[in-house]
Amino acid sequence: MKFQMIAAVLLIAFCLSVVVTARMELQDDEDMKNGSFQKRRTCIDTIPKSRCTAFQCKHSMKYRLSFCRKTCGTC
């Protein structure tokens, strides 16, 4: 029974990671088409509170170390 629970949790975690990765890649493709691909990666001090959702904050942190210092300052 324990093994089945562990297997179920691992399967759910794997599925969630695949969904999140696919969503982030889809967002990057949309940015390329819209021309905002470079804007996202330019250094900004803060994200406006209107755009500061948990997903937006997490997604912008992806580029934090190589491009910016405080991309999610208002989150």
Curated annotation (Swiss-Prot):
Residues 43-75 form the ShKT domain. It comes from the Eukaryota. One of its GO terms (molecular function) is potassium channel regulator activity. Keywords: Cleavage on pair of basic residues, Disulfide bond, Ion channel impairing toxin, Nematocyst, Neurotoxin, Potassium channel impairing toxin, Secreted, Signal, Toxin, Voltage-gated potassium channel impairing toxin. Residues 22-40 form a propeptide. The keyword Disulfide bond applies. Its main location: secreted. It is found in: Secreted; Nematocyst. The record marks 47, 49, 51, 60-61, 63, 67 as: Important residue for binding Kv1.3/KCNA3. Residues 1-21 form the signal peptide. Disulfide bonds join 43-75, 52-68, 57-72. One of its GO terms (cellular component) is extracellular region. InterPro entries: ShKT_dom (IPR003582). The record marks 62 as: Key residue for binding both Kv1.2/KCNA2 and Kv1.3/KCNA3 (occludes the channel pore like a cork in a bottle). Belongs to the sea anemone type 1 potassium channel toxin family. Type 1a subfamily. In PubMed:21339955, this protein is called kappa-TLTX-Hh1a. The TATX abbreviation is given to this protein, since the abbreviation TLTX was already given to a spider family. Inhibits voltage-gated potassium channels (Kv) with higher potency for Kv1.1/KCNA1 and Kv1.3/KCNA3. This is Kappa-thalatoxin-Hhe2a.
